[in-house]
Amino acid sequence: MARLNVKPTRMELSNLKNRLKTATRGHKLLKDKRDELMRRFVDLIRENNELRQTLEKELAANMKEFVLAKASENSLMVEELFAVPVHEVTLWIDIENIMSVNVPKFHVQSNTAREQEQGEFAYSYLSSNSEMDNTIQKTKELLEKLLRLAEVEKTCQLMADDIEKTRRRVNGLEYSIIPQLEETIHYIELKLEEAERASLVRIMKITS
């Protein structure tokens, strides 16, 4: 490890010791941050996998039910049923700070004003069968789970990026900056000891 190109003086020695103290403290803080990010990241990955598996099953089952319900209806009637949507959804995103990582928080709100006027669904109960009503209701209920999945996946991506950045900073301090400072401090201490011994020898020669 190449030492720093500085003059071997007591002032430089003091400055380097302060830098080493700061680097050591920063290294510990960054390691703690990395470890906590990793812990939360693992929890989110587990939630992401479980949520994705659950959603894939529920969406597939719901789509199958919808296809079966649609098969018992006239195709033209089905098109008319969904021709004029009345279910409006407002989506907004807040930002949450997790260990200095800004991650999205999705919120959804249904605008039910028109639904209350025209009924819960975008069609008349009299015009459709109960199976189709159930599948549409389940689809609406799955929306929040889909948003949560998107939120978790984006959070995992952002946290993974920050974990990698933090890991590089920790390694830079641990394997480069701190050893370089320690070696330079050791070098200056040796030089100062040599200078002190040489000065002592000169004094002894003068007094003798």
Curated annotation (Swiss-Prot):
Coiled coil: none
Protein's organism: Streptococcus pyogenes serotype M6 (strain ATCC BAA-946 / MGAS10394)
Superkingdom of source: Bacteria
Alphabetized PANTHER family for the sequence: V-TYPE ATP SYNTHASE SUBUNIT D (PTHR11671)
GO biological process per UniProt: proton motive force-driven plasma membrane ATP synthesis
InterPro entries: V_ATPase_D
Protein encoded by which gene: atpD
Keyword Ion transport: yes
Alphabetically ordered keywords of this record: ATP synthesis, Hydrogen ion transport, Ion transport, Transport
Protein name per its UniProtKB record: V-type ATP synthase subunit D
A molecular function (GO) term: proton-transporting ATPase activity, rotational mechanism
